[in-house]
Amino acid sequence: MLTIEQIRRIAQQSGARDITKVETDIVLTYVLQLFHEKGITEHIAFKGGTMLRKMIFGPRGRYSTDLDFTRRTDITDEEVMEMMLDALGEPYHGLSFRFDRDKDWYFTDRSLAANPVCLHAGNERGVKIKLEVSLREQPVLPARALPQIEQEYFQLLPFKPAAIPSLAYEEVVSEKVRAASQRSKIRDLHDLSEVAGRAFNRDLLRSLAVIKLWESDKAIRRPDRRR
């Protein structure tokens, strides 16, 4: 993991006021690389606000501590969890992970979620992030391996950030449309406002949004299989 001095320098050079946001972004880059090296991304596709910022929007994107994914193979719920637990069970390039398996990992009828604390020598209190894998539906469109937008700190990393299998752009946005229609959170509206100024396939987005809303309604009507 980068030293706290390096993180401070990166924050100063980028004009960031909050060093914690810079630190968190670096931590998320490490976790994405870890999941890539452990083969987890062969079964899940990156999506959500952090995906949009890291792969599409760059610095204009919204800050988030979440890494959101969706399952894209026939791997079971429990197998996904075991792969993630195994990956976070050991230190990775100076980054350690603290969590209570019984409290910080949980299933709903739609997803697997976890809240590990990521620690390193410069921050023993750690940074808490959220991991979530949607289990309710597989991608409509094929996932594509997308490169992360180059950051100045990439040259300081002990690895070259890998391209990460991600949902197609219009499919990510269609899930934002669905989320905005269901919960109207500022984060979704922020992401959609950034989308509005960019080129995209409107007909495809409209069709995907209808499918996502239909799938969501079907999931709500379905009994919770874990009760």
PLM ranges: what are they?
Residues 46-51:
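Glycine-rich beta-strand-to-loop/alpha-helix junction loops that act as flexible
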